[in-house]
Amino acid sequence: MEKSQLESRVHLLEQQKEQLESSLQDALAKLKNRDAKQTVQKHIDLLHTYNEIRDIALGMIGKVAEHEKCTSVELFDRFGVNGSE
């Protein structure tokens, strides 16, 4: 290849690199949190909260079932709730 062709190719590659770096910066700016450990910890915290709420709800359903002299499964069926939800 001639020197001018190589220089032209280098110039095109530099432009492509700048475009890719710009795209990367745009993508990184859209991320709410770039720290994976922090994201995982937030998900774990949310799962703990979900489990606490679910446990309370199941306890309350158990109390209602006891009061109505039926099973929790019967209450789930009555209200159209899948027991695994």
Curated annotation (Swiss-Prot):
InterPro entries tied to this protein: DNA-repair_Swi5 (IPR010760)
Keywords, alphabetical: DNA damage, DNA repair
One cellular component (GO) term of this entry: Swi5-Sfr1 complex
Gene Ontology BP annotations: DNA recombinase assembly; DNA recombination; DNA strand invasion; double-strand break repair via homologous recombination; gene conversion at mating-type locus; mating type switching; meiotic DNA recombinase assembly involved in reciprocal meiotic recombination; meiotic joint molecule formation
Role description: Required for normal mating-type switching. Also involved in the rhp51-dependent recombination DNA repair pathway.
PANTHER family: DNA REPAIR PROTEIN SWI5 HOMOLOG
Similarity-based family: Belongs to the SWI5/SAE3 family.
Quaternary structure annotation from Swiss-Prot or TrEMBL: Interacts with sfr1 and rhp51 during DNA repair. Interacts with swi2 and rhp51 during mating-type switching.
Protein name according to UniProt: Mating-type switching protein swi5
Organism of origin: Schizosaccharomyces pombe (strain 972 / ATCC 24843) (Fission yeast)
